[in-house]
Amino acid sequence: MSFIPHKPEQIEKMLGTIGASSIDQLFDEIPAHLRADTLKIKDGINEIQLANQMRKRANRNHHNTNFIGAGAYSHHIPAAIWDIVARGEFYTAYTPYQAEASQGGLQVIYEFQTMMAGLTGMDASNASMYDGATALAESVLMAIRSNKKAKSQKILIAEALHPTYLRVLETITKHQGIEFDIVNLDSKNGKTDITKLEDFANTDYAAVVIQSPNFLGQLADVDGITNWAHKHGALVIAVTNPMSLAILKSPAEWGENGADIVCGEGQPMGVPLASGGPYFGFMTCKMAHVRQMPGRIVGRTVDLDGNEGFCLTLQAREQHIRRAKATSNICTNQGLMVTAATIYMSLLGAKGLERVASISHENTTKLANELSKLDGVNARFNNVSFNEVVIDLPVNAEIFVTEMEKEGIDAGYFLGEYHSDLDNSIMVCATEIHTSEDIKEYIEATKKVLARIGG
């Protein structure tokens, strides 16, 4: 598969075919005054002078220190990752269909699947989904197909699930006869009270969805909920932050028999924050369910000459083979993001991932402890969390967040829209990129803002 750039005569021929006189004409819908002009750079300057000039221009942009999490996280991305990803051999987001010409790309995906299966403790992984929310929706559909014992298409979900995931799940399953029951959140401890599950004991469920760490950063009672679900004939779908699995037990170890399907958002591993995407969703499962798994799966094989190679496998599940009977409409994967994640995990290794996760947890704990020393400010829950905590404030949280922006800090995620009991609460997140100085500046800015708005 060639990635050689087009020659001028090839470009001219293509433009002639579509009736365009130039490449600029293809973008004529963009007003001229909005188009980027030539950079104004002095002639004859050396690289150091050029770098200094561009740095001064870049400093005109104002960058707040970010303490927002809520599903998208600021982690350090080693420079080598995107330098490699941007190479012509990798720089495509599409699935490598032509196995004999795509061995390198297929091997990257195979390595990704191996790493994700190891991280989650599952037997198999697909090549990725669009994002964490769609990965959950596909996991629910997969569980319904796979659980032959269930007589209904009902799913039990803990309210502490990420609200965006829930909305996407409802949208995708809206016309498929799938029903959801919600186990209400205990606003006193930020997670599902396992005793409330008995209210649903007489209902037949195909699956139970558990997010841990949940949307509020709390670690769910995964053992109790998993055992309850299996006792009542339901499969367990685990939604998790892959970074947390570097220091927490894997979903395969939840309860007596472990989760059946694991999914989530892969953005924390080498993918930058970029106005909501592109990210990638991951999905792994036990071998018993692999034939119901949606999306691409890369397998290792041997050719006619006995040489080891890679190919797309179990394709009879997919739309281009089964049409309407396929496991899913998805016929691709987030290949470019997966490449970044694979290189990220390879560069850091198990010890590196553990360090990132541990420092993130330590910094979050330190930030919460320092904030709790201020009058009227408290960490809402006393449970163990990973890298996010809910902070109660003595003032309206939405106003507080707005005022903190003026101090150069994105203070956290306003929770009032999520739960009526949390109007004066924000969720803050710290990772390995936050320094002691960053945390100190957050505390000083909080003091200043609370004094200004009456806290």
UniProtKB/Swiss-Prot annotation:
It catalyses: N(6)-[(R)-lipoyl]-L-lysyl-[glycine-cleavage complex H protein] + glycine + H(+) = N(6)-[(R)-S(8)-aminomethyldihydrolipoyl]-L-lysyl-[glycine-cleavage complex H protein] + CO2. The keyword Oxidoreductase applies. GO terms for biological process: glycine decarboxylation via glycine cleavage system; nucleoside metabolic process. GO terms for molecular function: glycine dehydrogenase (decarboxylating) activity. Keywords: Oxidoreductase. Its EC number is 1.4.4.2. Belongs to the GcvP family. N-terminal subunit subfamily. The glycine cleavage system is composed of four proteins: P, T, L and H. In this organism, the P 'protein' is a heterodimer of two subunits. This is Probable glycine dehydrogenase (decarboxylating) subunit 1. The gene is gcvPA.
